[in-house]
UniProtKB/Swiss-Prot annotation:
Binding residues for heparin: 97-100, 111-118
Organism from which the protein derives: Haementeria ghilianii
Positions of the record's site feature: Reactive bond: 34-35, 89-90
Name this protein carries in UniProt: Ghilanten
Location of this chain's protein in the cell: Secreted
């Protein structure tokens, strides 16, 4: 998912990539493409490079003023992404809660209630 969707531990990752448990974001597989692209490769909705050329150069960095409050400009994807709270020392068995933008904050998710399945 993009920066506004659930993290990869909850939503999974596309084929060929893995979930980084520290950032809760998908890591991108290496692009193996025999095409030279003067402006670099296009990116998928996950922010991973794909074997298609960009038609114009990518901006050096996105503008922080373009990002909603509580988010930052990612140099990797040139998109607004969640800030990671490096001061949060909580160990949460069900993960951290997320705000309305899909960003984690330093509060544990409650225990999941088990609902019996009907046969």
């Amino acid at each position: 998912q993009g920066p506004f969707g659930p993290g990869c531990e909850e939503a999974g990752c596309p084929e060929g990539s893995a979930c980084n448990i520290i950032t809760d974001r998908c890591t991108c597989p290496e692009v193996r493409c025999r095409v030279y692209c003067s402006h670099g490769f296009q990116r998928s909705r996950y922010g991973c490079e794909v074997c298609r050329c960009r038609t114009e150069p990518m901006k050096a960095t996105c503008d922080i003023s373009e990002c909603p409050e509580g988010m930052m400009c990612s140099r990797l994807t040139n998109k607004c992404d969640c800030k990671i709270d490096i001061n949060c020392r909580k160990t949460c068995p069900n993960g951290l809660k997320r705000d309305k933008l899909g960003c984690e904050y330093c509060e544990c998710k409650p225990k999941r209630k088990l609902v019996p399945r009907l046969s």
